[in-house]
Amino acid sequence: MLEHFRAGWAKVMNPIANALLRAHVTPDVVTWIGTIGAVLMALICFPQGWLWQGPWLVTLFIFSDSLDGNMARKLGRHSQWGSFLDSTLDRFGDAAIFVGVALYFAGPGHSMLWTAMACAALVFGMATSYVRAKAESLGLEAKMGIATRAERLLV
């Protein structure tokens, strides 16, 4: 569903990517900053119960996920290493979101059911990524599924 917006989103992100490249910021730096920011925001905001502010702050850092690849392509440096780094750090960002939500629901006054659901979302999110990576490492195409990463995080 959200994949339909990719072309339009690229037009929005191009000027930002160009500005960062002019400032000599590398795609890997953008990847790291985005991940560290998303992890910190998720682990600070969600356990504190900032369930409206937290997603906005986390989303600001997750936007870097579309910037780093854009920047690498503009530099002609789109590489397997960059792809590996990006997808690996994405898992840390995703995990922090679910851990932050689980910590919130583990607090007083909440049902453990919600904590369990956040933990299940973490497990299934990691499993989805692992299954795709493993299939691709075996030469299989693994493009199927009901939701992309962006859609899984949105839900």
State what each model feature region is:
Residues 53-99, 127, 131-136:
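Acidic (Asp/Glu-rich) catalytic motifs at the cytosolic membrane interface
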Residues 1-56:
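Topogenic membrane-insertion module of multi-pass membrane proteins
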Residues 27-31, 57-61, 87, 117, ...:
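Alpha-helical transmembrane segments of multi-pass membrane proteins, especially transporters
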Residues 30, 50, 65, 78, ...:
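Short glycine- and Lys/Arg-enriched binding-loop motifs that mark or flank ligand-binding interfaces
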Residues 33-40, 56-60, 64, 99, ...:
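Lipid-exposed faces of alpha-helical membrane segments in multi-pass integral membrane proteins
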Residues 44-48, 67-71, 100-107:
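Membrane-helix exit/interface motif
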Residues 23-26, 46, 50, 75-78, ...:
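Membrane-interfacial loop-to-transmembrane-helix junctions in polytopic alpha-helical membrane proteins
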Residues 1-17, 88-155:
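A feature for the membrane-embedded catalytic helix bundles of lipid/isoprenoid biosynthetic enzymes
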